[in-house]
Amino acid sequence: MKHARFTPAAVVELEDAVRRVDRARPGWGDKLNDEVLEAIERIEEYVEGWQTFDERGPERRFVLDRFPCIVVYVVTDTEIQITAVVYGGREPGYWRKRR
């Protein structure tokens, strides 16, 4: 089984999203963090179970259920790279510059 690894940029995005949610609703930042970690477990279990964005690149997306958040990941030969944790309505495809 391939394991997931967060890129530094994705770590920063997750931390920022957790803080933003917690400021709006105390305690909910932890719920967001937990849901992202659960998503990572599902991604590791079913690596290719979620669709790619389009034919322009290898990125796949996992949409969270309870939060307006998408986990963007790329499957390599050795691992699953979590390249972005997109919270809210950020500019579509901004993470593609990270390739």
Q: Model-flagged regions — what are they?
A:
Residues 38, 45-79:
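Basic/aromatic recognition patch in beta-strand/loop cores that engages polyanionic ligands
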Residues 19, 26, 41, 45-48, ...:
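Generic structural signal for secondary-structure transition and capping sites
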Residues 1-35:
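Arg/Lys-rich, positively charged N-terminal/basic patches that mediate binding to nucleic acids
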Residues 67-70, 74-99:
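Enriched for short, Lys/Arg-rich terminal
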Residues 30-31, 51-53, 94:
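Short, hydrophobic secondary-structure boundary micro-motifs
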